[in-house]
Amino acid sequence: MAADRAQNLQDTFLNHVRKTKTPLTIFLVNGVKLQGIVTWFDNFCLLLRRDGHSQLVYKHAISTIMPGAPIQLFEGGEDAPA
């Protein structure tokens, strides 16, 4: 069934930036700025890689994620699926 395979926006976004190796700037709730590419993620954390080093970042500590380049998650000109 199609609903079984549907992903939420967060997973769609993270999977896209992981596959395309899009550089990200991540701001944590305490104001710390992290930069790198996502190499792995699950429901609770993500692995951020930069300069050969990896950081495990818990999602509950993330405030904002900004991609280094524009991304298009969905086909067509709409921002979100209908």
From Swiss-Prot:
InterPro entries, per database record: Hfq, LSM_dom_sf, Sm
GO terms for cellular component: cytosol
Domain of life from the UniProt record: Bacteria
GO molecular function: RNA binding
RNA-binding as UniProt keyword: yes
NCBIfam families: Hfq, PRK00395.1
HAMAP family assigned: Hfq
PANTHER family listed in its UniProt record: RNA-BINDING PROTEIN HFQ
Name of this protein: RNA-binding protein Hfq
